[in-house]
Amino acid sequence: MPATTAETLSLVNRSVSVAPLVLLSVVDHYNRTQANKSKSKRVVGVLLGQNDGKNVRVSNSFAVPFEEDDKDPSVWFLDHNYVESMNDMFKKVNAREKLIGWYHSGPKLRASDLDINELFKRYTPNPLLVIVDVQPKETGVPTDAYFAVDEIKDDGTTTSKTFVHTPSIIEAEEAEEIGVEHLLRDIRDVAVGTLSTRITNQMRSLQGLHHRLRDIQAYLQKVLDGQLPVNHAILGNLQDVFNLLPNLSTPKSGPGATGTNADSELNHAMSIKTNDQLMAIYLSSLIRAITAFHDLIENKIQNRQQQEENDAKKKEGENGEKKEGADKKEGSPAAANGESKEKENSPKEKKK
């Protein structure tokens, strides 16, 4: 039965969250497979979790033996008996985790994905496909989630199967978050300030936005050239995104005002705001430098005072040793005189 627009929108609006354990398992599966092969081939596995119709939680996964022909995409092999036996064993361990879909290492959709997806419909009505980019070239979420739907064409021809993209996030459970925080606590660089962290995050966000805009531009260009059919659902979503953009044009000051004069107020306001932000950054840097100089001077003064105290103690010790030596020298002649007197008296006693 062809999927209606409402059903397609319900699939697109589903919240898909992937646990970090799944990403670790997929990467480990890929590395173990590539170690025994000369060519890099994609790997396929099964996703386990919960799907309540609105939220999809992918919490676990397991690998599946899979082979395909590089020259003919329609020739592939997936051991469904292995899938059934592993699924039964996972049910005994955790009955809450059910088979909700499958994954492969992509990094893009393949021609045989629709046929593989039909195979997984034996186990779940609407399987979820998650493509995990095991070798990402850009920063961002390394997962892409898809649901298969029947696309209704405008010319009245027969429907065709296609995948619709749904947003996905990486979300860890509380125990996983505690473990990650414990590991990162020892390797986190405390010297990195909050400002640099914010700037790095904003730069990564802008890079991801630029990548998405390039994808949108390439898609619209292909639709314009006739390489792809017109999809009203995608165009409607793009129009909603464009409608959210702020109106940066200012009203004209008079009937004879030109566009340049009309936008001068906006440019002036943006310049003032930018200058204020740069002034705040400059003042904060200046205050931080002055504080560092103050701490340096305080450390110098403390080191000098401590050095003077050590020198004074050292001089006192040397003076004390000199006095003791002088006292010993003064006492030794008196003792010698006493001994000589005793020797003089001793012969007299003998004579008596």
Curated annotation (Swiss-Prot):
Residues 16-152 form the MPN domain. GO terms for molecular function: metallopeptidase activity. GO terms for biological process: proteasome-mediated ubiquitin-dependent protein catabolic process. Keywords: Proteasome. One of its GO terms (cellular component) is mitotic spindle midzone. Signal peptide: none annotated. Residues 306-331, 339-352 have a biased composition (Basic and acidic residues). Residues 303-352 are annotated as: Disordered. Pfam families: JAB (PF01398), MitMem_reg (PF13012). Acts as a regulatory subunit of the 26S proteasome which is involved in the ATP-dependent degradation of ubiquitinated proteins. PANTHER family: 26S PROTEASOME NON-ATPASE REGULATORY SUBUNIT 7, EUKARYOTIC TRANSLATION INITIATION FACTOR 3 SUBUNIT F-RELATED. Belongs to the peptidase M67A family. This is 26S proteasome regulatory subunit rpn-8. The gene is rpn-8.
